[in-house]
Amino acid sequence: MTYSYTEKKRIRKDFGKLPAVMDVPYLLSIQLDSYHDFLQQDVAIEDRQEVGLHAAFKSVFPIVSFSGNAALEYVSYRLGQPVFDVAECQLRGVTYAAPLRVKVRLIIYDKESSTKAIKDIKEQEVYMGEVPLMTENGTFVINGTERVIVSQLHRSPGVFFDHDKGKTHSSGKLLYSARIIPYRGSWLDFEFDPKDCVFVRIDRRRKLPATILLRALGYAADEMLEMFFENSLFEVEGGEYFLDLVPSRLRGDIAIFEIKDDEGNLIVEEGRRVTARHIRQMEKAGLKRLRVPSSYLLGKVTATNIADPSTGEVIVECNTEITDDAIEKIEKAGIKRIETLYTNDLDCGPFVSDTLRIDATRSQLEALVEIYRMMRPGEPPTKESAENLFNNLFFSEERYDLSAVGRMKFNRRLGREETEGLGVLSHSDIIDVLRTLIDIRNGKGVVDDIDHLGNRRVRSVGEMAENQFRVGLVRVERAVKERLSMAESEGLMPQDLINAKPVAAAVKEFFGSSQLSQFMDQNNPLSEVTHKRRVSALGPGGLTRERAGFEVRDVHPTHYGRVCPIETPEGPNIGLINSLATYARTNTYGFLESPYRKVVDGLVTDDIEYLSAIEESDYVIAQASAAVDENGRLIDELVTVRHKNEFTVMPPEKVTLMDVSPRQVVSVAASLIPFLEHDDANRALMGSNMQRQAVPTLKAEKPLVGTGMERYVAQDSGVCVVARRGGVVVSVDAARIVVRVSDDETEAGDAGVDIYNLTKYQRSNQNTCINQRSLVMEGDEVARGDVLADGPSVDLGELALGQNMRIAFMPWNGYNFEDSILVSERVVQEDRFTTIHIQELTCVARDTKLGPEEVTADIPNVGESALAKLDDSGIIYIGAEVEPGDILVGKVTPKGETQLTPEEKLLRAIFGEKASDVKDTSLRVSTGMRGTVIDVQVFTRDGVEKDQRAKEIEQTELNKFRKDLNDEYKIVEGATFERLRSALLGQSVIGGPGLKKGDTLTEVHFNAFEKEEWFKLNMADEQLNELLEKAEGQLQERRKSIEDRYEDKKRKLQSGDDLAPGVLKIVKVYVAVKRRIQPGDKMAGRHGNKGVISAIKPVEDMPYDEQGNPVDIVLNPLGVPSRMNVGQVLETHLGAAAKGLGDKINRMLAEQKQAAEIRKFLHEIYNGIGGRNEDLDSLSDSEVLVLAANLKKGVPMATPVFDGAKEKEIKEMLRLADMDDSGQVWLYDGRTGERFERQVTVGYMYMLKLNHLVDDKMHARSTGSYSLVTQQPLGGKAQFGGQRFGEMEVWALEAYGAAYTLQEMLTVKSDDVNGRTKMYKNIVDGDHRMEPGMPESFNVLVKEIRSLGIDIELEAN
């Protein structure tokens, strides 16, 4: 087994027993793949699939003019290069996007000719706005901020059958319904009412009898009856009636006459119910015709019109009940055949027949008019408009589209063979749906489960962007149609026809303000990954929080391996926002799939098959943990399996598939919780969610007890620097890494240099600090995919959200009552939970009515000391330490002119403008913020002179860029000459600098040559001369391209910035604030065990063990039993063992033991106790010593979810670390020195500091701003608001009879305007009296009552 550069430095002891069949897939692929398919940027034009942008254009074009004489066709599109790269976009606050250019063809036909002859063709590229590009980490930069488009889980298009669960009618009768949901277009519902008639609704409007829809489709009444019913045939012979008998149809009827066979033997007596036995006897006797009395026909319903044979007059219409009167007419007319509908109450109800009776329409036109009236009430219908409306509803490709998914689901549900077909409905589609609905009502077939993941599909970024794009194009289409008619006469070009604004607006609106376009959660790498893998049922076209019931939110059996059953927010969104399971992916239709291993005759293979929830139900699926022997054969007699969404047991030979990994059930966040299998689900949910809120600490520390998923999350999150290609590290400093790529990975003409600029102290969306630290040294060899630099919350390429703390479970003087946490002062001293937060403060200089605002150090009425930290431009220096009230950017605003006296006017006219008054509007540090200025950015409008500071910043940027380019060139040049040297060494020359014909080149010559002299060599071998020429050409080309890039960068930097109207200059100041941990901060473990720090106590007061080592944190043991998250206790024990082993290794290193001895001990740890074996023999002695040095602080362990360390193994580990296997020790009280009366569980737990810091929440106000109407203080820290003294608080004061306190609360401390200003003045003068007056809110009440027309006046008392 090969270890990567970082892995071999610190190997995790893995307790997993199950084989790794399949690696964890790339975690962001759902975002990247979806958007890649949308853009198809790197696909050749002719190879583009009909998806994404291509499909959107194809669906709207060609656009034909109203007259049909001109058409605009779509040819292809291409995306240009973005103007700014990602970093520049974030800095400048612009969108990272590429211009979209579409090639269209305008065709004008000849009006005069009878056939369509083409008169003119014009082709042109048209600019269609900008399309946002996705960064390589699956995010979008919109207006300078990183955003994520969350995938949406919505109801798949298709047909669904359901019932109302008996809620509609008081009798509790189940009313069945069918609904055809298209991808876009009108919904079509069929539903039963309590009287068993079938109705239809279009777009949830008022209902009509379903037969109206069938009539509108062109079916007559008898055709409808023929489609939905079987007929019974009666023949009339000599006044007697004979029934063509189908024996099974009599079942359950009560015989109203005796039934005999042809020989006259009695089969059923009169008055008896016909049973299955009777039917068998009739079939045996071969009874084909049965003589029935005429009364048997009464109440039967005719299937066709019965007409008099002689006159042709209809005696009995179809679908009417036969009465005595009708029988008389039939006999009179001498009719020989009567067809009636066969119905019964069991499995063949008379639903369509009953519906036809309540249907008042008689012809297709009447039906169309009826539908028109329902859709457009109040508009007078005409034949054309009624027909148009109906055809556009379901049969027009422009208005209606089932989509490929919808058609596939539709055909599957109706049991058809083919899965493809038209996007619009056909007549047979509607009839089949109605027929299936009636079958379900008749008891054949079942209703659908709408929460089944086979009926819900995922819409990812690409698809949603495509829909928005199509919306924009449809708007464009309307405008183009109108202009096309002009194009015929005026010879316009395509560019004049298309206005791209609507497209750009639709796309911008989607990315900027859609409910699913969210501000990226950037607290730490895990929160980024989770955000991109989130699946939401909310959003446009989805559910709303208020309407979503319990079933939608619940865990469904089909979630297994597709959606995580654990990770979902607490609160109103629970169950509506989910996370993808670790191995899940979406298929072409958008359904979630999960991977399984194939099992053949009880033998588990390594073939992997992805299945969606629909396909999965037919298989028998064993769990990943099922016992197998070394050949991969299932050993148990009965295996736990899933089959048809149920858990059961089956013999091994029936098993067809097996899970890939135990963690395929849960999401990434849940799979990071060690011993997850020992935690209660509710606490695991909190654990998953709180890991996302962990703030990156100053020094990241890997968890001693992990799950093995940490490495995947860190690498896939994109916060680390990962080597794009293998090679040798040439130079490293704090801000960049340069790698010379190895020859086998470079393509011809490629530089073979990779420069990685590290992100230094950048602000994240959550104001945490993003900083990358290099891991490599000069001369190190790295392979593709190795981690070169750690990001925030990453330690040696592993996710590290918190710190390993030494904890004890014991009470301590009530300081850990109710989940409080007691912390040692040492934790603060060692900066274990110190975090850096970066605030961005912005100062905007605008052009006002009175003149421009100015950024300057010349501020009126400000002392020298306040300006000490500002430079000449009035902007603070980088590195300055600032505190509340300090000026960051000096700015002055022109004040309104006072009225001038005539004398002053005269003087001003004579002596010129006197500097008009200005007021100080500088940007100052807000209250409660102390920190260091780490960066300043100045943006200046085009045409405004840049200040000195802006020029300096610009120059620094350019110099940095120049250095990168020079280094790149140096390495390329070095590599080129290296290649030439090896090719030319020992070859003979014809001529050259200081050489004569026939000389042989040696090392001495090469060292003496100047660089340009190499290319003056004339070699005897022609091929070598070509090589020299080519090398010279390549270097010149490279030099030119580097100069071009430099000039391009210079142009970008020196051009003015595109600022909002009226803005002249923007100065952004970044202040880094160091936050140490303090009482009131929220901390948590990974098992949902959260708490608030109650106190920080001196080290000497903390409990200590027999060696004198104090604990760092004291937790309350009562937090464990009721919460049932025992995982934290197991983690504590295993953490203790890991730390103990680290101490043991540390002692060995201190005693300078031989590498062989250390290797032997490492073998015991890694390969002696349970879990996977590590290949330590592949490491050299020096690598073993590096590994040991990295294990000094503890041996990291991995206990994968559902496949983790067993209790026995934890005990063995504790013994190996020379510790008591109970995991408990004697502790002594730090204050008295006495031993506690029983042993205490002490170990190491991984604790996180969450982004709920007391600094951000603590707030106090004396006076401040007030609400405009009520004049009451505002609320909340952001508005600098007051504390609300609410209704209940008033009751409390009333209960105590504290009348004066209550009076001041309701008046001078709230909204009595005069009273409070007077009181403020009095307090300033040292006088503490107050005069309460009328609260403003009372005046508001009086005004509101008056506005109702009721006069109300206050009487003076």
Curated annotation (Swiss-Prot):
Chain segments annotated as transmembrane: none
Gene Ontology annotations of biological process type: DNA-templated transcription
Catalytic activity: RNA(n) + a ribonucleoside 5'-triphosphate = RNA(n+1) + diphosphate
Gene Ontology molecular functions: DNA binding; DNA-directed RNA polymerase activity; ribonucleoside binding
Pfam families: RNA_pol_Rpb2_1, RNA_pol_Rpb2_2, RNA_pol_Rpb2_3, RNA_pol_Rpb2_45, RNA_pol_Rpb2_6, RNA_pol_Rpb2_7
PANTHER family attached to this UniProt entry: DNA-DIRECTED RNA POLYMERASE I SUBUNIT 2
Quaternary structure and partners: The RNAP catalytic core consists of 2 alpha, 1 beta, 1 beta' and 1 omega subunit. When a sigma factor is associated with the core the holoenzyme is formed, which can initiate transcription.
Protein's recorded name: DNA-directed RNA polymerase subunit beta
